[in-house]
Each structure stands twice: as C-alpha cells, then as structure tokens.
Amino acid sequence: MTELLKTWLTQGPAGQQLISFNHHDIVTGSLFATQVYHLHQRLQARPEKRWLLACDSSDLFAVGLCAALLSGKQIILPANTQPGTLSELTQEFDAIVSDRPLCEGKIWLELKKELSLPHSPWPQMAEGDGFGELLLFTSGSSGQPKAVRKRLQQLDAEVSVLEQTFAAHLPHCSVIATVSHQHIYGLLFKILWPLAASRPFLSDLVEYPETLSYYTALFPNLCLISSPAQLSRLPDAVEHERQLHTPSLIFSSGGPLSLEAAQGVKRCYGSLPIEVYGSTETGGIGYRRQQSSDTPWQAFAPMELSNDSDGALLLRSPYLEDNGQYRCEDKVRLLGEGQFCLEGRLDRIVKIEEKRLSLVQMETLLNAHPWVTQSHLVLLENPRVQLGAAVELSTAGKAQLEAEGKLSINNALKAHLLSQFERVTLPRRWRYPQQLPLNAQGKLLKNDILELFDHD
C-alpha cells in the first residue's frame, strides 16, 4: 500500500501548490510551509507532549496539525469546544494550539496567519524521530468520552485507499465541506486526503446554500464533503439558486442518509452522493450510491468482514491499530464479494444532526439536576429524527412544574445540558410522567415510553 500521506508530510508541499482558498484569500505551499515551520519551532521549544488542537479555520487547523505531527506531539481533538466538554478533558492535555484561548491555566500557542514571517523551508524530522499521533474523543457506550488513538500509519492507510478508490472521479478538483474538521470524517476528507493528493480545500465551512452555489459556479470541478442533515435540506435550499456547475463528486457520512434525501441530491446535481459508512474507531468501512432503500454497501478493498452470533459486524482493517479485529455495534447481513446490508444498532449511541451522542451520558447529566429523579431518552424518527426526553421529576421539580409550567422546566433542563452538549443535539420533545414505566423487574418499558410521544 502506498504511503501517500507520510510521503507528503515528509517532503512538504511544492511552493506553488495551492493549499487552501476562500472568497478573499489563498494559501500557497510556500506560505503554508513557512507557517508550519515557525509553529514547529515553537512546539519543539516546549516540553509539553499533549496538545489540544481546535480552530474553526481549516487552513490554520492544518498548520497546527502538520506542525504538531512533525514535532512528535500527541494531538488531542475534542468533539467540540463546549466548556463542559473541555472541563471533562482537562486531565487529557497539557497545552493548547488554537486561534483563541479556551482554558485558563493552560499553555496556549496562538494560531494565526502571519504574512510577515521570513520565508522558511518545510521542517525536517531528525533521524530516529517519529511522527506524532492523534487522540480523538467520542461518546463511549458507558456515557463517558472515549479516547480513540490514531497513528499516522492508520490515517495514511485510509488516505491511500480513498485516493485509489475515488481519484479517477476527481480530476483537478477543489474540495469544499459543510462538516467540521474536528471529527474523523472532516479530518480525513477535508484536510488530510486533499493535502496528500494536492487538492486545494476551502478554508471556511460552507454554512449557507448561497455559499455552496457561489463555489459551484466558480469551480467547474468541485468535490463536496457533506452530511445527511445538510444534504436532506439541499433540494429546498438550492431550488431558487441557478446552478451553473454541479460537483464532480458528493460525499455523505456521519449518519444514515434517507433514500428520499439521496434522490433529492440527484435531482439537484444529476448524480447520487457517495455515502461512506464507518466510525471514529474504524475509519471508513464501506460506501454506496443509494439507488434503492436496500442498496448494499461495498467494503473498501482492504477490509475483512465477518459477524458474530448477535449479527454484529467483526472487522479486520489496516485502519485499526496493529491491523486488529474490531466488533462494531451495528448488526449486518453479509452478502459476499465484500457487500453487506446494515440492520440497525446494538447499543445506545445515536446520531443527531450527524453529531454522535451517548444517550447514557446525557441521561447521567439530566439525572444530576435537582429537579430530576430519573430520565430516559429515546430516538424519535417521525416526522423527523429527533430526541425525546421522558423525565420523572423530583419533589422540587414537580413544585416548579406546578408553579411555572412545562416550558420553564424545558428551558431549565436544556440550559443544564448545554454545559456539555451542543444545542442541535438536545431533546426537542419533553414528557413529565408521574413515574417512568417499569416492569416487575424494575426495567424500563421502552414501548410504553415511546407511547408518551404519540401525541403532542
């Protein structure tokens, strides 16, 4: 297998390689190398090994990522920069590389574009030095943030396979994304793969349909990195925007894409998006273009698939540490020739707006509120995917409900959850039964809880 990413990181970009762009600026390989060199020097002078990296601008993030990898540092990527999230991770990092201060009491190296720096070459690693590694934090099944370590060789294996699989469809393409680079999907598809394959990427996040239309009109060859939540809204969003060009390729990952959404994208742009199935732990496992609801997935070339007695997917992959085996919490039906169908989750990790969410973790935080005795969260899928919260209130909570009403309770509990969770992941529907439904063994009756949400 080629070492596309390692080769690029060792040699650095060509001086005239276009690294990134936005509507008013470009970053060339020469400028990028200079920025990486000077941050690398600052990191090398620091004894701290574990550096939290967070930055909204993708070109500055890439500077921080490359400098830290070449310095042999461990790079901590939080799921988000909410105060509660960073507080939970405070023992996991020693210092911060960011465009803004995030935590008091931690060493902070500021990421900023400095055009006055003297021209400098790409940093060279000393013989015997190793590349740094990444530590990504996701929602573990226990409800606590789970650390997922990624060595360069694992990321390199995936970048190389992506290039081998899709390069023929990406002639002279630029890359734009509606997803964050702080998560594994955006990190790979928006930052690492484009860098290694010399494809320029948009440094800003595409947040509005008119921005998408602007860049599709500007570039005849464009690759769009997106997610189901955003693609499902695309047909309505671009209905009144004349499309001069269409993306050469559209990727979707981070959660299931409905058949309706896939067909909607085809109506907009003339081709189906390529869905990528995987996780932070596994990287990409398979891909498909959804012609019908039962279109099977095709495993990427190096994957070895099997399943256990529960139907859970067992995976062997070079993207895993030591090329080991991993048990996924997805039930699958294997079809042969690397094809498979997904048949649902076996745990309580869900995706809300492509944000990976532990229901256990959110319930634990809810239950810590003085107005709550016990809570249970359910995923509601009609009329759209959203979270429902069934909450048994404490005596104080019931008094508040009686005095101030349901809306007051809703808002207070949402504010409580915002200390650790992003707003888009919060429950949209709330129920306050006198007691949560239990069976004789004290187990929650899920169907009875779902019935609480049958009527508004």
Language-model features: locations:
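Conserved pre-ATP/AMP-binding loop-to-beta segment of ANL
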Residues: 3-16, 115, 119-137, 168-175
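Conserved AMP-binding/adenylate-forming core of the ANL superfamily
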Residues: 6-7, 14-45, 150-153
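Conserved AMP-binding/adenylate-forming
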Residues: 41-81, 173-181
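Conserved C-terminal "lid"/linker of ANL adenylate-forming enzymes
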Residues: 350, 390, 413-456
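Conserved AMP-binding/adenylation subdomain of ANL enzymes
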Residues: 157-174, 182-223
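Conserved AMP-binding A3 loop
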Residues: 26-29, 133-160
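Gly/Ser/Thr-rich phosphate-binding loop
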Residues: 237-293, 304-306
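AMP-binding/adenylate-forming catalytic core of the ANL superfamily
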Residues: 331-425
